[in-house]
Design a protein with these regions (language model features):
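N-terminal pre-domain segments of enzymes
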Residues: 1-64
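Extracellular beta-strand-rich solenoid/capping regions of secreted or surface-exposed proteins
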Residues: 83-90, 102-116, 127-144, 150-167
Length: 543
C-alpha cells in the first residue's frame, strides 16, 4: 500500500471508522465485507453487484456523509484533479466536467474505501487516463465508462494500464484499457501487512469486471499480456480481449473463476490459463477467434505470414492455414494453441503437482475449429502432459456448472460475439477511435495498423516476436495503431458545483443553487448524484 497516499487519506478513513464506515484490509472471504441491498447501479451483476461505492456504508445507521468531487482540471495533481478525488478519504463520487487527456506523472493510488468514478459524465469525447496506472488498493469501488491507456514505454517501470491490489466489493463496467507494459489489467489479490508480521496475500473478493476492453498490451519486454484476474465470488462477463500475446486472461487466484460470454481475439501463445488444484472453473459460452498472430512461428517472415493469412481469410480457408502454416500442433501430436480454450494448472506446491481443479467448459465457440466447438473437451482443454482427452476429462471435467452469481441473461457464444462488439468498452459519452479500430479488426479478422507505422527503437526492448509484429496485431508503440486521438468537450453549466448540471437538476425538480441536494438519499436508496450518473440516456444524448 502506497505510504504517501495512505497518509493523505488516513484521517478521513479513521474518522469514518468511528462513524460506522469501516476499512477492512484483512478481508479474505466474501462474507467479510458487508454488501448493499441495492445494486451498485442498474445493470450491475456478479460478485461486485452490491458494492457500496461512493454511497458508503454505515453500520451505525447514522447519516452517510458522502462527498462529490468534480474533476475540472486535466492536470496530474492539484485542486479539481482526478488525483485529488481518488486519493482523498471518505465516501466520494467522482464526476467530470472536463474532457481530454489526464496524463499522470506518477500512479494514482486509491487506498481509502467507498468511491465511485463515473467516466460517463465527462462532456464531449470524454476523458482518457495516460502516462501511469490507476491502482485500486481498497474495497467498495465502482468504476464505469473510463479509459485507461497508459502508453508509457519505459521498460524499467512495467506497470499495468489499470488494476491494483483490490480488497473486494469492486466492479469495473464499460471501461477501455490498453497499452500496458505488464498486463493491461490485474486484479485478483491484495496484501495484508500486519505490524511486525509476515504479509498475507489474500484473495480479492466480490469482484465483477463486465463489458470492458483489454487490448494491445505493449510488447516491449515479451509482456503484451491481457490480464491477470481472479478472486472469490467473481464474475468476468461480456469483455473483449484482443491483440495480446498471452494471459487472455491468466487465472491468478484459486477458488471460483466465472468467465462467461467473453470474446478473445488474436492471441499468440496463450489464451486462458492458470488456476491451481483448488480452482473451480466455469468457462461458459465464450467466443474464441484466432487471428494472424495466433500460433505464429516467430522464425518466419512476418510479411509472408500476413500475406498467407490474408489469402486464406479471403478464401475462407483459415482452418487449413492454422493446421498447415502456423507451426502449432501440425505434427498431429501436440494440441494446437489455435483452438485452446483453457490450460488449467496443477497444484502450486511440490506435494500436489498431480492434483487438478475441476472445470465446467461448455458452449464455447472456437472459430474455424468445428470439432472443438461441438465438444469443447475435444482438444479445447489442454493441461500439460497428462494424456489424451479421455484422461483429461476424467481428471478435470465437471458435468455441471459450479454455483455462481451469474448474469441475468447468459447468452450463447454467437450472441456474445455480436453483443460484445456492439456494446463493449467506454461507449459513453462515445466510443473513441482506439476502440473503434480494435472492434473493426475483430470483425474483419485482421487487426488494424497505421499506414505510417514504424518499428519502435529502444535500447531496453527484449522480444521474441519480430520488430514488425504490429502487422500481426502485436504492437510496441501506440503510434503503430494511430496513437491517441484528441478528446474535446465543452463543460456543462453547474451553478452550485455539486456535480449535477443545471438542466438535469431542473428536469428532476432539484434546485441548481443548492449544493447539498447531490448527496441527499432518495426513496430508491440512491443519492441524487447517483441518479444523475446512472441516467445514461442523458449522456447518450450528448447533453
Amino acid at each position: 500500500m502506497n505510504g504517501a497516499a495512505w497518509q493523505k487519506a488516513m484521517p478521513d478513513v479513521v474518522r469514518g471508522m468511528f462513524e460506522g464506515k469501516p476499512f477492512v484490509p484483512q478481508c479474505s472471504k466474501p462474507c467479510d465485507l458487508k454488501q448493499a441491498n441495492i445494486p451498485a447501479f442498474p445493470g450491475a451483476e456478479g460478485g461486485g453487484m452490491y458494492s457500496f461505492g461512493g454511497r458508503g456504508v454505515n453500520y451505525l445507521c447514522a447519516p452517510v456523509s458522502s462527498k462529490v468531487y468534480v474533476v475540472t482540471s486535466l492536470a496530474d495533481s492539484g485542486p479539481g484533479t482526478l488525483r485529488e478525488a481518488c486519493e482523498a478519504g471518505g465516501p466520494r463520487v467522482v464526476v467530470f466536467n472536463v474532457a481530454g487527456e489526464i496524463k499522470l506523472k506518477r500512479p494514482i493510488n486509491i487506498v481509502a474505501p467507498y468511491i465511485t468514478i463515473a467516466g460517463q459524465t465527462a462532456p464531449g469525447d470524454g476523458i482518457v487516463i495516460t502516462g501511469e496506472t490507476m491502482l485500486v488498493d481498497t474495497h467498495d469501488v465502482i468504476i464505469r465508462y473510463t479509459r485507461f491507456r497508459r502508453g508509457a514505454m519505459d521498460v524499467a517501470h512495467r506497470d499495468d494500464a489499470c488494476g491494483g491490489n483490490g480488497i473486494g466489493n469492486i466492479i469495473y463496467d464499460h471501461c477501455s484499457a490498453s497499452w500496458g507494459l505488464d498486463e493491461v489489467m490485474s486484479m485478483y489479490r491484495h496484501v495484508y501487512a500486519r505490524h511486525n508480521k509476515k504479509q498475507d496475500k489474500l484473495p480479492t473478493v466480490n469482484i465483477t469486471i463486465q463489458d470492458c476492453i483489454f487490448a494491445h498490451g505493449l510488447d516491449l519486454y515479451n509482456h503484451a499480456f491481457g490480464a491477470s484476474i481472479g478472486g472469490h465470488n467473481s464474475l468476468f462477463a461480456r469483455n473483449l480481449f484482443a491483440n495480446n500475446i498471452s494471459r487472455n486472461p491468466s487465472i491468478a487466484m484459486n477458488g471460483d473463476f466465472n468467465f462467461v460470454n467473453n470474446v478473445i481475439f488474436n492471441w499468440w501463445n496463450r489464451s486462458i490459463d492458470g488456476g491451481d488444484n483448488l480452482s473451480e472453473y466455469n468457462i461458459i459460452n465464450n467466443y474464441f477467434k484466432p487471428g494472424p498472430v495466433t500460433g505464429f512461428d516467430q522464425t518466419k517472415n512476418v510479411d509472408k505470414t500476413i500475406a498467407a493469412y490474408r489469402k486464406a481469410l479471403k478464401k475462407g480457408r483459415l482452418y487449413v492455414y492454422y493446421t498447415s502454416e502456423t507451426g502449432s500442433g501440425k505434427d498431429g501430436k501436440a494440441p494446437s494453441i489455435c483452438y485452446r480454450i483453457l490450460k488449467p494448472e496443477h497444484g502450486r506446491s511440490k506435494d500436489n503437482q498431480n492434483a487438478w481443479g475441476k472445470a465446467y467448459v461448455s458452449g464455447n465457440v472456437v472459430e474455424y475449429f468445428d470439432n472443438v466447438t461441438r465438444d469443447n473437451w475435444d482438444g479445447g482443454v489442454q493441461p500439460a502432459d497428462i494424456g489424451g482427452k479421455d484422461r483429461i476429462a476424467s481428471l478435470l471435467k465437471s458435468d455441471k456448472p459450479f454455483a455462481y452469481n451469474k448474469p441475468q441473461n447468459v447468452m450463447s457464444a454467437a450472441e456474445s460475439y455480436a453483443y460484445v462488439l456492439d456494446n463493449v468498452g467506454a461507449t459513453i459519452p462515445r466510443r473513441d477511435n482506439v476502440d473503434a479500430t480494435i472492434i473493426q479488426g475483430v470483425r474483419d479478422g485482421l487487426p488494424y495498423y497505421a499506414k505510417d507505422a514504424a518499428v519502435h527503437v529502444s535500447p531496453y526492448s527484449k522480444r521474441r516476436l519480430p520488430d514488425n509484429s504490429y502487422k500481426l496485431g502485436i504492437i510496441t508503440d501506440p503510434q503503430q495503431t494511430g496513437g491517441l486521438p484528441i478528446y474535446n468537450g465543452t463543460p456543462r453549466t453547474d451553478t452550485d458545483n455539486d456535480g449535477m448540471p443545471d438542466d438535469w437538476e431542473k428536469a428532476h425538480a432539484l434546485n441548481p443553487a443548492d449544493p447539498t441536494d447531490a448527496t441527499a438519499l432518495t426513496p430508491s436508496g440512491y443519492m441524487n448524484i447517483e441518479l444523475y450518473i446512472n441516467d445514461l440516456e442523458y449522456f447518450k444524448a450528448g447533453k
